[in-house]
Amino acid sequence: MEKREELYRGKAKSVYKTDDANRLILLFRNDTSAFDGKRIEQLDRKGMVNNKFNAFIMQKLEAAGIPTQFDKLLGDNECLVKKLDMIPVECVVRNYAAGSLVKRLGVEEGLKLNPYTFELFLKDDAKGDPFINESHVVAFGWGTAEQLARMKELSLKVNDVLSKLFDDAGLLLVDFKLEFGVFHDGSIVLGDEFSPDGCRLWDKDTKKKMDKDRFRQGLGDVIEAYEEVANRLGVPL
């Protein structure tokens, strides 16, 4: 597989074309951002940890019948993925109250949600990734009703699979965000990544935060927490 020019550079990953029109290379960088990119720092080992963590999770999801963008690892910081036409909507599943939900509704952090909640946000840093609903997605042409239904179905299946996986490792899956895209055959596929950058994970007993909130809130030991989560899951680093 030949790596070609950079196609897109995000806050923490770069995307490269390849000699296969249906495949891309994702490069996980050490860049760590918060507050819609207003704060960016370099954290040693982060790109490697997130790349291998993502590979592990995506393979678990594939084994559970969830179609993902991931093809294979290419090295410590790179993986090969399917090229998708990304839908500019983030799907957020919440099992416990945290983050923007606490700010919006004034509820107590850590409140168990029964049942879980499913939310949509427009992927637009300049607008602060605003909270939207399903009718917005269809009305503005960001996706179809059928695509949304499939995205929700897959998001909830991801929640079922990963809640158990993390629970077995002594962790609470507090919430997470997912992004989806359309493959060349028209199917909806889970894209982007799944890592401690895009979810909240707490130790079941101590409620210690083991995710990117350690960076957002200045708690320190960010990568050490990521590595502990990986080790508990058995991710080969």
From Swiss-Prot:
One of its GO terms (molecular function) is phosphoribosylaminoimidazolesuccinocarboxamide synthase activity. Pathway: Purine metabolism; IMP biosynthesis via de novo pathway; 5-amino-1-(5-phospho-D-ribosyl)imidazole-4-carboxamide from 5-amino-1-(5-phospho-D-ribosyl)imidazole-4-carboxylate: step 1/2. The keyword Iron does not apply. Keywords: ATP-binding, Ligase, Nucleotide-binding, Purine biosynthesis. Its EC number is 6.3.2.6. One of its GO terms (cellular component) is cytosol. SUPFAM superfamilies: SAICAR synthase-like (SSF56104). GO terms for biological process: 'de novo' IMP biosynthetic process; cobalamin biosynthetic process. InterPro entries: SAICAR_synt/ADE2_N, SAICAR_synt_PurC, SAICAR_synth, SAICAR_synthetase, SAICAR_synthetase_CS. The keyword Secreted does not apply. Gene3D superfamilies: ATP-grasp fold, B domain (3.30.470.20), Phosphorylase Kinase, domain 1 (3.30.200.20). It is an enzyme of class 6 (ligase). It catalyses: 5-amino-1-(5-phospho-D-ribosyl)imidazole-4-carboxylate + L-aspartate + ATP = (2S)-2-[5-amino-1-(5-phospho-beta-D-ribosyl)imidazole-4-carboxamido]succinate + ADP + phosphate + 2 H(+). Belongs to the SAICAR synthetase family. HAMAP family: SAICAR_synth. This is Phosphoribosylaminoimidazole-succinocarboxamide synthase. It comes from Pseudomonas fluorescens (strain SBW25). The gene is purC.
